[in-house]
Amino acid sequence: MTNIRKTHPLAKIINDSFVDLPAPSNISAWWNFGSLLGICLILQILTGLFLAMHYTSDTTTAFSSVTHICRDVNYGWIIRYMHANGASMFFICLFLHVGRGLYYGSYMFPETWNIGIILLFTTMATAFMGYVLPWGQMSFWGATVITNLLSAVPYIGTDLVEWIWGGFSVDKATLTRFFAFHFILPFIILALAAIHLLFLHETGSNNPSGIPSDSDKIPFHPYYTIKDVLGALLLILMLMTLVLFSPDLLGDPDNYTPANPLSTPPHIKPEWYFLFAYAILRSIPNKLGGVLALILSILILAVVPLLHTSNQRSMMFRPLSQCLFWLLVADLLTLTWIGGQPVEYPFIAIGQLASILYFMLLLVLMPIASIIENSLLKW
């Protein structure tokens, strides 16, 4: 009798994706982040579901309902902080996953890469709307500032903003719809992740060397299942350390003050994982220009495969490109730092330089470095 996991229509899909999947024998720990993102997503959906059971999306009670969850609901505090810090872990894994893709040339799978970009945008939208729900000062003003950016759209801008708000300011209608979208989007992310995986399994995984590995494949189970379990344990260890020892480390103290439309916080800033994009937005004095730069800071990933000029796929054997890659990492860390600083000298100048360098690296310097490396190999 044939094994049921190989014959049953549903079990067969799972078997071909997680058990008998042929995987390259040399993929490193940088390939763990796909499974870690899956774990993060499931964790966020589960904790979010339990939070939604007690949360009320009304401007008068939203802040109180979150307080109620933390004070009165059984283990509500841990669910709330696991959800809030789970988002941070999610984005850490996301950035490392994208960074891995850039370094090892995984973007040469165009369908997988493009679905990944859509996933990144969707996750950022979900996180933004989730940040609005506790209805603290930073929630309210963050929502006001970011949605207001759409008013930069020529001709229809103002109408567009009021349509999203459901009125003439961020109010009850805005909060209710943000809650509805924040609830549904993770399930859309789940579906997109399945498509992401589907496209990946059409080609098979890339590997650190960037060389086709068809001649040297090993079964996913038990080798990579046990490796993923180790990654998952480390992820949960980091998350729970954060949740149990310093749950508010990555949050903003202003969000413990209920939203007040009459009092603006001294420094409006988003969560840490949006600071790099926020810094790019603020670096451009023109409103529409800033909004375009903000969108392009992520959308630029879509042109990376088109600008791949190297004869090699991976950066593993390309020292010049490696230097530029790590310069890009340092640049993004600089932008993250600048995004959290007030708009004054010298932060404005540093932010503008870092923003220019970011686009220069991806659009100009890296493709040129690849061409230089190609010519060096001909000597």
Curated annotation (Swiss-Prot):
Alphabetical GO biological process terms: mitochondrial electron transport, ubiquinol to cytochrome c
Annotated transmembrane regions: 33-53, 77-98, 113-133, 178-198, 226-246, 288-308, 320-340, 347-367
Cofactors named for this entry: heme b
Pfam families: Cytochrom_B_C (PF00032), Cytochrome_B (PF00033)
Membrane topology: Multi-pass membrane protein
Swiss-Prot/TrEMBL keywords: Electron transport, Heme, Iron, Membrane, Metal-binding, Mitochondrion, Mitochondrion inner membrane, Respiratory chain, Transmembrane, Transmembrane helix, Transport, Ubiquinone
GO cellular component, one term: respiratory chain complex III
Localization per Swiss-Prot or TrEMBL: Mitochondrion inner membrane
Binding site for heme b b562: 83, 182
Molecular function, one GO term: metal ion binding
Stored CDD domains: cytochrome_b_C, Cytochrome_b_N
InterPro entries listed in its UniProt record: Cyt_b/b6_C, Cyt_b/b6_C_sf, Cyt_b/b6_N, Cytb/b6-like_sf, Cytochrome_b, Cytochrome_b_C_euk/bac, Cytochrome_b_N_euk/bac, Di-haem_cyt_TM
Additional remark text: Heme 1 (or BL or b562) is low-potential and absorbs at about 562 nm, and heme 2 (or BH or b566) is high-potential and absorbs at about 566 nm.
The protein's assembly and partners: The cytochrome bc1 complex contains 11 subunits: 3 respiratory subunits (MT-CYB, CYC1 and UQCRFS1), 2 core proteins (UQCRC1 and UQCRC2) and 6 low-molecular weight proteins (UQCRH/QCR6, UQCRB/QCR7, UQCRQ/QCR8, UQCR10/QCR9, UQCR11/QCR10 and a cleavage product of UQCRFS1). This cytochrome bc1 complex then forms a dimer.
Function: Component of the ubiquinol-cytochrome c reductase complex (complex III or cytochrome b-c1 complex) that is part of the mitochondrial respiratory chain. The b-c1 complex mediates electron transfer from ubiquinol to cytochrome c. Contributes to the generation of a proton gradient across the mitochondrial membrane that is then used for ATP synthesis.
Name this protein carries in UniProt: Cytochrome b
UniProt organism field: Aonyx cinereus
Lineage, top ranks: Eukaryota, Metazoa, Chordata, Craniata, Vertebrata
